[in-house]
Structure formats: C-alpha cells, structure tokens
Amino acid sequence: SQDTCRTWARELMSSTGNVSPDDAMQLATDLIHTGKLTTFQLNSLLEPIPRPLALGPYRIVDTLSDLLGLNWVQATDIHRGTSLWCIQWTRDDLQRPSYKAWPPSVDLAKHHSRIDGPALDRWESVLAEPGYLACFCESLHGQPLSQLLSQGPLSVESSIRMMRDTVSAIAGLHDQDLIHGAITPESIWKCSEDQFRMRRDPIIPPQSPYSASWNSVITTPEILRHATAAPEFTLPGTEPSRQSDLYALGVVWAHALLGRIPWPKSDRLDTNGWKKTHQQVPIELPASCPEPVARCIRYLVAKNPSSRFRDASQLAKAIASLDGAS
C-alpha cells in the first residue's frame, strides 16, 4: 500500500542519512537490500504496463518462470505469511489467440479448489477481477519426474510407489467427474523419498494433446504431450476422458522404467507419425521389467479403450497386488 511504502521510505531515509526520496532508484536499491522489495517486484513496477503486485490477500514477490513456465509467480499470503505458487494473466494475456480459442474457466477452478487429497497438489483460490485472473496453489518441494529421469530410470519398486500415489490422485479427480488431461512426466513430482504428488491444471479445460491452442498451466514440451496421447485422439472431436488419462499413466510408467520416451524414433516423429505410432506400435519396456508390471502397463496402453482397465480403482487394485514384483 502507499502508506506502507511511505513508512519504508521514512525508515530508509533515517537509516541512510536522510537520502532524498527524489532519488527513486537509490531508494529502490535500498528497499531491495533491506528485503522490503524484490528485484522482480521492481522490474514489474518499471514495465510500461505494470503487472499487479498485490492480488486480494496475496503479495507477488518473485517469478517462477524458470521452474514452472510463463506467467507463474511466487506469492505470499499477507495474513498467514505462507508461500504459494500463482498462475496469473492480465487482460492482454487473455486476448492471445490460444486463450480466446480455449479460455480459462473460473467455475472449473472453483471445482478443483474444493478437491483435496494426499497425492494431489492443493489449489487454494481463484481471483477474477477486470484487469487480471489468478489462481493460487500450495508450493511443492522436490522435482518433476522429467528432471528425475534425466539422471536415469526409476527402479521397479520406485515406479510402483509412484504409480500408487498418482493413481490415488487420478481416482480422486475421476470420482468428482474431473479429467486430468495433461498427465506427463512434467505433472508428477517426487516430493520426498516416499511420496509423489500430482500437479493438475485447475483452470484451463482439458483438450486434445494435438490441439494447436494447447495452453495448459502445466508447461509441457510438445514431444511429451504427443508421447502420452491416446490412440483415440486421432479421431476428430475426441475429448480427454478417464480412459485417455489411464493411457497416459501407462506411458509415463514405461517412461519411468526406461528413463526415456518408450516409443521408437520418438525424436523424429511429426504429428502424423505420433498418431500412427499410438495406433500401431507396441510400447517399449526394459527387458528386466517383471511380467506382472509389464502386464499392467500393456493393459493401460491398449490401443482399444475398452481393453484398458475399467477405471482408476481397478488399476489401484492391480498395483496393490504387485508387492514383491521387483
């Protein structure tokens, strides 16, 4: 607030020998050095059209673009002092063609904010004002599966643990008639030795992985989106479903065991090549993969949706039976 800024200015003027407040950059530098202002906040204020740094009860303190992608920032709850992640858009952002073609849904975000679970990320609130739209979620500690796999494949035991957590998360969404629609190694985080968490997109409605207007808040390389696209997406008008979520889980499981995308020539496939691959080519698995695990994965990635597990609950039971499979 302006009153807070005036108080800080008076404090700084006193502590620095009454430096003139007319020296705006000196004052800003001192505010950064004393922890009152972040470099990100200063840069935001200096933009031709400044982005808001206070949204409802939240203060925007830093960018998370390197970690999470465009429009992600770190926020602090002013009243509780807790740190949160925030995805935010200005009016200009939402005028981009991809958002106009596939706009955010505040109603969807409110639905997601009411759903919680130990293996799901927690979305706290959505703020929609004339000049901006923002969603706030808890901060996750750890690293995405994609980064973890850059160091090598998971063990069978770790992959089963990952699947238990992620299937629990997906079952919680499906039970509330919500489709994830963006399951890739970017949406699964290892938060501790014993826990994986599923990130979700609470505000952009799920869409085909091949969509030209793809703008999920979970920043995902095109190759990973296409690698997890169920065969039925080759049909025009196909929408994400429970079955396409299960297919994506199977691909991610195989990816985790191999340490790479489990389809041949994946780095050379165009969109048509990916569609033919999902329709015709068997998924790749390591030779050392135990047969009970391989059987689960093959059920998940069956070309015909009716040949897959019926739902996430049936998959959870199959995974529970894998104790000792490693």
Q: Can you name each region flagged by the protein language model?
A:
Residues 116-124:
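Conserved HxN/HPN-centered segment at the entrance to the catalytic loop
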Residues 216-232:
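Conserved activation segment of eukaryotic-like protein kinases, specifically the C-terminal portion
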Residues 1-112, 123, 129, 135-137, ...:
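Non-catalytic accessory regions
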Residues 168-178:
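Protein kinase catalytic-loop region centered on the HRD/HxD motif
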Residues 145-154:
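AlphaC helix of the protein kinase catalytic domain
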Residues 227-325:
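C-terminal lobe helix-coil module of Hanks-type protein kinase domains
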